[in-house]
Amino acid sequence: MRTSLIALAAALISVTSAGAQTVVIVRHGEKVDTSSDPALSAAGEARAAALAAALRGAGVSTVIATPLKRTRSTAQPTAAAAGLTVTSIGFDGGQPIHVAAVAALARQAPATATVLVVGHSNTVPEIARALGDADPQPLTDCDFDRMTVIQLGAGAPKVVHARYGAPTSAC
């Protein structure tokens, strides 16, 4: 896991510069079952803690998740470490409206801030695309360790695809 955290730190540093906003987009951690609103498993809780540790000191000013337990529980350790509450954006109106609302809120953060967005396998790539990732990584139901880091500022967005926490196994 240490190597993963070092890789994450390198990804954040490679896209961060003065006057630029950084958006970190991840899928929720591993879940206990396949019900409609499951809690995180022990592995998911460990992943949420690893994310918070990796983002400590990154200037996180906004944490966004869906109302579902697994996204909120993944986001909560980072929010708590930054003294923030998790902002919840639901799916009223469907996925396209959700994606647009998340992207709009992320863009409203201060210009030098870091925003954490925790989504789902079907929303993470679309949120990344809405924020300027021309080639977002598709996620399978087994992908929990991927993250997209996007630097928004003058010019085209800078995008880094990275992994964090323990590697997830293939489906």
Language-model regions: role of each:
Residues 113-116:
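Acidic/histidine-rich alpha-helical segments that form the ligand environment
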Residues 1-4:
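Positively charged n-region of N-terminal signal peptides that target proteins for export
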Residues 118-120:
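Short beta-strand segments
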Residues 20-110, 124-171:
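Active-site-proximal alpha-helix that buttresses catalytic centers in soluble enzyme cores
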Residues 6-15:
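Bacterial N-terminal signal peptides
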